[in-house]
Amino acid sequence: MTGGSGAVAGGVSGGTATVALSLASAAIWGTSDFVGGIAARRLPSSAVVTLSHSLSLAMLVSLALLHRSTWPDTPSVIYGALAGLACGTGVMVLYKALSLGGMGLTAAVSGVLAAVLPVLWAFVTEGLPRVPQIAGIVLAAVAIWMIGRAPGSPSSKQAILLGAAAGGSFGCLFILLKLAGRGGVLWPLAWSRLASATLAVIVTWIATRRAGGVKRDATPMLSWPGWPVLGLIAIAGIFDASGNTFYTIATRLGRLDIAAVLSSLYPASTILLAAVLLKERTTRSQAAGMALALVAVVLISA
C-alpha cells in the first residue's frame, strides 16, 4: 500500500468541501436518475442517453469555452473518454431497470458495487483513511444496500446481472473521473460526454436496425417523444453533467473513497422524489438506511 500517513493527511485536507460536493453530486445524480427513469418509460434508454448526453455535451463545451479552461493533456482526454463509455453503459442499464417500474435489487447491487470498487482502488493508491472514516465508509455501504433494496424485489438472475453491470460501470466511472480530473474539470468531462453520447447513438442505431428500421407502429426509437418528455430528458442530462462536475471537483480536493461512497448515496434522493411525487411508499428498511447514511456522513466528516 502506498501513501501512508501522507495519504491520510491529504484526505483531511479539503475534507469538508469533499463531503459537501459529494453529497451534492449524490442528490443531483439521484434527481437525474428519477427524471431519466420516467423519460425511459416513453423512449428506449439508449435514446434517452443519446439526447440527454448530447445536450449536456453542448453545455459542458460552452462552459469550458466561456471559462477559458486549459486544454487537458492526453492522459486526461483518454481517461475522460473511458469514463464516458463507463457512464454511458451504466446509465443505459440503470434507466432500463428504472423503466421497468422500480429499482429493487438492481439498485442495491449497483450502489454497493459502485462504491466498493473506488474504495479498494483508493486503499491501494492513497493508503488507508482514518479509523472514523473507515467506519463511516462501511456504514455508508450498508446504508446504500438498505436504501436500494426493497422487500419483494425480484431476486432474479437478470436483476443481479443488471445491478452488477450498472455498479461495475459506475465504479469504473468514479475511478476514471478521478484520473481525468488531474488535467482539469470541464474539458475532460466534455470528452467523457462525447464518448457516452457516441456510445448511446451506436446502441440506438443497432436497436433500431434489429427492430426493423424506423416504423411508426414497430418501434419508438426515433419517433417524436413530445415536448414534456424532451423537457425531462434535458433536465436529466443537465443534472447528470452537474453531478459529474461536483464529483470530479470533490476528488480533486480530497480522497477518492470518501467522494465515491458519499456520491453512491444517490438512490436516496431518487426514492425520496418517488415518495413525494409518485406517492411510492418508502419502506422501514429504506428509512433506516437513510438514517444510517447520516451517521456515516458524520463519521466520514469527523
What does each of the following model-derived ranges do?
Residues T2-A27, V35-G36, A40-S46, L51-A81, ...:
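Membrane-interface interhelical linkers
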Residues S54-L60, V109-F123, A195-L199, G243-F246, ...:
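Alpha-helical transmembrane segments of compact multi-pass small-molecule transporters, enriched
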Residues S22, S46-T50, G80, G104-A108, ...:
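Hydrophobic/aromatic positions within or immediately flanking transmembrane alpha-helices
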Residues A27, T31, S62, T89, ...:
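Residue positions within transmembrane alpha-helices of multi-pass solute transporters
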Residues L55, L60, V116-L120, P129-R149, ...:
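Hydrophobic transmembrane alpha-helices of multi-pass small-molecule transport proteins
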Residues Q158-L186, P228-V229:
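Selected transmembrane alpha-helices and immediately adjacent juxtamembrane segments
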Residues L85-G90, V138-R149, A195-V203, P267-I271:
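Alpha-helical transmembrane segments and their membrane-interface exit regions
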Residues A39, V48, A97, F123-P129, ...:
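Hydrophobic/aromatic residues within transmembrane alpha-helices
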